Every structure is written in C-alpha cells, then in structure tokens.
Amino acid sequence: MTLIVTGAAGFIGANIVKALNERGETRIIAVDNLTRADKFKNLVDCEIDDYLDKTEFVERFARGDFGKVRAVFHEGACSDTMETDGRYMMDNNFRYSRAVLDACLAQGTQFLYASSAAIYGGSSRFVEAREFEAPLNVYGYSKFLFDQVIRRVMPSAKSQIAGFRYFNVYGPRESHKGRMASVAFHNFNQFRAEGKVKLFGEYNGYGPGEQTRDFVSVEDVAKVNLHFFDHPQKSGIFNLGTGRAQPFNDIATTVVNTLRALEGQPALTLAEQVEQGLVEYVPFPDALRGKYQCFTQADQTTLRAAGYDAPFLTVQEGVDRYVRWLFGQL
C-alpha cells in the first residue's frame, strides 16, 4: 500500500522516509519543493517509488490518482520563524495543510502531521490546551490555526489524525536549513572553524549558557511518528519533546568532547572548556531581548497516555551520535 511523505527532502521528512525504508517500506511517494535543489542530497540513500512537486500533489491526491494510500506524513512547511511574509506563510502552512487534510479525510487515509512548539510562544507551560497557546510570530500562528481546525474536525473524523508539536529538533539531514538549523549543527561547524563554541551570556536571570530548551533528536521524532502510524486508532495533538529542559551548555560541551574524543583527546568539564577558551560567552544581543524563550520543556502526559512509552535520548546521547555522523560526512 502506498505511503506519502510531504517535505520528504527536508529535515524531518527525509528522516521519516529513511526510517520507513529501514522497516522495508519503499512504496513511498516523496513530495517536496526542490527550488532549493541541494535538498535532494537528503534522499540519495533513500528508496522511494515516485517524486512529485508540491504544486501538483494535492490536486492529484484528491482526485485519487495514487489509488489506496494508507498514510500521509505531512512534514512540508515553511519552518523559518523569522519569515515575515504572512501571506506566504499562511498559504504554505495553513491553506495547503487544510487541502491535504481534506483529501485524507475523504479517502480514509491516516494523517500524521508536523505541528510545532512555537504555538506556545511565551508561555511558561507547554501543555496541549488552548489556555497555554500564544504564538509570537506568524509561523507559530500558522501552526496554531491549523491545530484549531484539527480540534474541530477530529471528533467526526473516521480516520486517524495525529499532530506532533516538535520542540527543538536536531540531527542528520538538516544542513540545508542554514540559520534555522539546530544549535548542535552550528556548534559543530563553529568549533571546527574557530576552535571554540560561542554561547549567549547571562540573560533574564539565567547564567551564561544556562538558557534551556527541550532538545529532541530527530531519531526520536521519527520513532514517535512510526509508532502512531502503527496505531491508527490513536488520534490527537501531542507534544514531541524529551520532557527534559537542558541548557545550551550541555549541547556545547557534548559537541566539544565528542570532537575531542574523535581526535583521541580526553573529555573536559564545562569549567575546563571555558578556562581553555573552547567555550566562550558573548553578550546577549539587544535585538533578541523580550523576544527570546529562555525555557521550553514538553509536557509528555498526553503522549504517554496514548501509549508511547519508549525513552528519549538525552542531549549527551543524541548530540554525541549526531556529531559522529556529521564528522563521518566530512
């Protein structure tokens, strides 16, 4: 039976395609926009049945051109939180997603899609409930508005709808994202280029490098998607994070120590790395004051209640794996 992955050449989409391949699934239609042509590299080691541009996909899918489709993993979106073209963002992330959803509902196709923790904005609690949702940018609003649509249609839906609010995802196949790539990716490249990693200094009551995020490996993101694919009776909107808030210092020290280990050098504590100039703190930029989240942490209650009980990689585990993968790509 056919599977469809939108955003298939992107970061999370390509990892889902690869994870499906590892289970023997190759009847996959990859949908994307390759205007940024170098994204094709994310699919070079993947097996797919067909490729379609996003502009032709929805109409053909709604028309039934692909026969029986078991599931759509809808990962295609503009994920640039700095994008200021609201019309583009709403058309790409909201209108397009509604069209894919409508086609899935009409055909009884499982619909698993990418939501975002950006929906929570400046909230201090990260629970899948309306009172905690206050997006700070048009990207977050586009995701929020689509989740509101999902809440309205889910009670009457005859097929699965599962949305995942991704927290700070890092891992292989993100290099095309540029400035929107993960902190781990940028720390890796900065350390190789300059011999040190730079982090923000003290801000808003948090010490240097102590601002925290829920950093989640794309390995775990793919696993959660496939778990719900295997359990089509489970619908809902779910936070997809580790449930742990870890400081940027943890990312930096893990990147540095993994690269040191690859060169046969011993691990160092954070204090030792700072003392040796391997980690450096820079003044917090004025442009980000009042617009910066110093803390995110996924509430996993809904996810765990739905039956997902596997552990999540810590920053130390996941970033170590990722740095070794990046090093192997050099």
UniProtKB/Swiss-Prot annotation:
Pathway the protein contributes to: Nucleotide-sugar biosynthesis; ADP-L-glycero-beta-D-manno-heptose biosynthesis; ADP-L-glycero-beta-D-manno-heptose from D-glycero-beta-D-manno-heptose 7-phosphate: step 4/4
SUPFAM superfamilies, per database record: NAD(P)-binding Rossmann-fold domains
List of residues binding NADP(+): 11-12, 32-33, 39, 54, 75-79, 92, 143, 169, 177
Cofactor(s) this protein requires: NADP(+)
InterPro entries named in the record: Epimerase_deHydtase, Heptose_epim, NAD(P)-bd_dom_sf
GO molecular function: ADP-glyceromanno-heptose 6-epimerase activity; NADP binding
Record comment regarding domains: Contains a large N-terminal NADP-binding domain, and a smaller C-terminal substrate-binding domain.
Subunit record text: Homopentamer.
Protein name: ADP-L-glycero-D-manno-heptose-6-epimerase
Provenance organism: Burkholderia pseudomallei (strain K96243)
